[in-house]
A protein has these predicted regions:
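The serine-hydrolase catalytic nucleophile loop
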Residues: 33-46, 204
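Alpha/beta-hydrolase fold nucleophile elbow
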Residues: 91-101
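N-terminal cap/lid segment of alpha/beta-hydrolase-fold proteins
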Residues: 1-21
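Conserved alpha/beta-hydrolase
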Residues: 46-68
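Short beta-strand element of the alpha/beta-hydrolase
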Residues: 24-32
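Short glycine-enriched nucleophile-adjacent loop
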Residues: 104-115, 121
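Catalytic nucleophile-loop/oxyanion-hole region of alpha/beta-hydrolase
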Residues: 65-90
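The alpha/beta-hydrolase serine catalytic core
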Residues: 117-222, 227-261
Length: 261
């Protein structure tokens, strides 16, 4: 595979991305925490978009994949800035944001900041507020004290032998982006896919998003035997159905451009 394109932010910071031209609305994939743009869902959506002539973009947040920086030194604010950079500088016209896990949080942040550019949202095991509701809430008092005093904590990683390390500044920064504490001023079509066997992000998070969002066009798809990764063939088939339906709805509403770069 060819090297990704590089978008320079500063002398030391850059975002790696892959972009394909097509019809509007464009689709931007937002990966999960610790994941990158080469994951199965990103590649599946890219293949679908190319087959249907839809504009598509996937990228790595700073501290992830082939972008600059380290995950330990970046946070929700940084990754939200990366999504905004991609929307403002690497895409044109209306966009559908597809967010997986962490990406489901960032898509909410980005929509609040760029409501004129986002025309639809799809969350896959979306995890808004996970720093507070999942990481911090899951710690004992001793672990919380340790996290504060040492500046980080290492927890078991369900997908690898090495633990996942969460810096305390990630929790502190996350408090400025909590979205499920009141009304979420997003009046866009929202589609939420979640597995009921998700051991990382409870499926009830999807219902909380639906309850908080001001939009009445919110649909939740719960899959009883699906886990957090949501990457099995039947789960990807559902994702295909949902993205196809949302694109069709947006085109029917006239809220799109005919062709995007």
């Amino acid at each position: 595979m060819s090297d990704p394109m590089i978008h320079t932010i500063t002398e030391t910071d850059h975002i790696a991305y892959r972009r394909f031209s097509g019809n509007g609305p464009g689709i931007i994939f937002l990966a999960g925490h610790g994941s990158d743009m080469e994951g199965s869902k990103a590649l599946f959506l890219e293949e679908w978009a190319q087959a249907h002539g839809q504009a598509f973009l996937r990228f790595d947040y700073r501290g992830h994949g082939q972008s600059s920086g380290s995950m330990d030194a970046t946070n929700i604010s940084d990754w939200t800035e990366d999504v905004i950079t991609v929307i403002d500088e690497l895409s044109e016209g209306p966009q559908i944001l597809v967010g997986s896990s962490l990406g489901g949080w960032l898509m909410l942040n980005a929509t609040l900041l760029r409501p004129e550019r986002v025309v639809g949202l799809i969350g896959i095991a979306a995890a808004p507020d996970f720093t507070e509701d999942l990481i911090l809430a899951g710690l004992t008092d001793d672990q919380r004290s340790q996290m504060q005093s040492k500046g980080r904590i290492a927890l078991p990683n369900p997908y690898a032998d090495e633990p996942v390390v969460y810096p305390y500044h990630l929790v502190e920064d996350g408090r400025g982006h909590l979205r499920l504490r009141g009304t979420l001023d997003i009046d866009k079509p929202i589609r939420l896919l979640h597995g009921m066997q998700d051991a990382e992000v409870p499926w009830q998070t999807a219902t909380r998003i639906a309850e908080c969002a001001s939009s009445n066009d919110v649909r939740i798809h719960l899959i009883k035997d699906a886990g957090h990764r949501f990457s099995e063939p039947q789960q990807l088939d559902l994702l295909q159905q949902v993205i196809s339906g949302l694109v069709a709805d947006i085109i029917a509403s006239g809220d799109q451009k005919s062709r995007l770069p």
